[in-house]
Amino acid sequence: ENKIEVLKGINLEIEKGEMCVLLGPSGSGKSTLLNIIGAIEYADDGYIAINGEKTKLMNEKQLTMYRRKHLGYVFQMYNLIPNLTVRENIEVGAYLSDNPLDIDELMATLGIADQANKLPAQLSGGQQQRTSIGRAIVKNPDILLCDEPTGALDSNTSKEILKLLEDINQKYGNTVIMVTHNDAIKNMADRVFTLHDGEIRKNYVNENKVNAKDLEW
């Protein structure tokens, strides 16, 4: 049986509180790497250590608690619960935390306070993604994992969502790890990893960081 190596020779270190971008074309392995960091998938060799804890040494119950307490996930598809309001969707995330953020303050930060009682079907794509981010961040996770969070949005709405992720990173101090194929987005990152064919080809600290609102593509 021929095995395909999706990732090979990966070695990366991310500092607490950094805005980090994993950049690469489709099929480069960036989403798989994000899933391994998030303990959704597992590597055949090597390990992920977050705050010194190796996820491969945890049993399933420990992993579940670890994901709940320390990780937040934002995907290209919003995955909101259709029969719950904006507030209720965010509350789902709050229930998973011992130390959730204040929901009213968070909705104001997200720019969706006036949409609190609406259902997902009544929202624009950008409003749905803001709600999805709210559900992920209300847990106050150490790390926010974002897989193509602007992939389904137009460029103006994309920049609004990126500005929101930037604001959250600065306000709450969460480490943000974002997967994207959009080369321009790397300019807002503190640290950039460029992937190609399952390998990290570039790894650098961005000395000329640009505000999300000033990104151009």
Segments (PLM) and residue ranges:
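ABC family nucleotide-binding domain
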Residues: 1-188, 192
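Conserved beta-strand-loop-alpha-helix hinge in the C-terminal portion
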Residues: 199-217
